[in-house]
Amino acid sequence: MVVKIGIIKCGNIGTSPVLDLLLDERADRPNIDVCVVGSGAKMNPDEIERAVPTMLEMERDFVIFISPNPGAPGPAKARELLSAADVPAMIIGDAPGLRVKDEIEEQGLGYIIVKADPMIGARREFLDPTEMASFNSDVIKVLAFTGAYRVVQNTIDAMIADVEAGKAPELPQVVIDTDKAVEAAGYTNPYAKAKAMAAYEIATKVADIDVRGCFMVQDPDQYIPIVASAHEMLSAAAKLAIEAREIEKANDTVLRTPHGKEGKTLSKKDLLAKPE
């Protein structure tokens, strides 16, 4: 059986660029068919009203909508459209989504909230395309090496397994905090685990500082160094995440969870071992 998955990307968070790739890392998984529709960097209601209906015209077993701030007007419109549609759907968002998770549940939708997927320092004086790309590369490193992406992978794989079993997919209600992320990372060395925990906690705080610099402070002489400091924090978090993985590599205990020939999730730690 081939499970048909729809992914709608509107705006961008650090999970967005790799979401579909987490499900098919070698592009050879036989049991899923993934279609992605998006609206680029923008997520206003107008973009949403084009992107979501486009996806709903397709035959999908379930749909995932990913964006920053699920409570913002555009994502709120997406939730409204998906709630009214005859297809199981879930929302993936960043920490502001915590404020509307009860509302998401009431709409009959699932959710994954990634607390350490932080808002970027979107001030024109500071953020250019190079800085934007650097920020997102740091987010990806943090979320990959702290285990957050594995939580996303496992959660969606469970939905795929439900569909394969002939059941409606169980819609998740997952908040990825430090403990949940690092548990999924499977660190063996306690120092590696501590570094990963520190990385996730720092990344979680980055959003608070960027919100202050982007919305609460109006003097450029103040908000420019504020958002710059948030990006420096994230860079430090990425370095800690890399250090955590390097410790595990030195001990040959890196947990890897590839998808097998039939699409099932396998596991291994020894580098030269076959995944089982």
Swiss-Prot record:
Reactions catalysed, as given in the entry: 5,10-methylenetetrahydromethanopterin + oxidized coenzyme F420-(gamma-L-Glu)(n) + 2 H(+) = 5,10-methenyl-5,6,7,8-tetrahydromethanopterin + reduced coenzyme F420-(gamma-L-Glu)(n)
Protein task: Catalyzes the reversible reduction of methenyl-H(4)MPT(+) to methylene-H(4)MPT.
Keyword field: Methanogenesis, One-carbon metabolism, Oxidoreductase
One MF term in the entry's GO annotations: ferredoxin hydrogenase activity
Record-level GO BP terms: methanogenesis, from carbon dioxide; one-carbon metabolic process
Comp. bias intervals (Basic and acidic residues): 259-276
pH dependence: Optimum pH is 6.0. Optimum pH is 4.0.
Gene: mtd
Protein name as it appears in the record: F420-dependent methylenetetrahydromethanopterin dehydrogenase
Signal peptide: none
Species of the source: Methanothermobacter marburgensis (strain ATCC BAA-927 / DSM 2133 / JCM 14651 / NBRC 100331 / OCM 82 / Marburg)
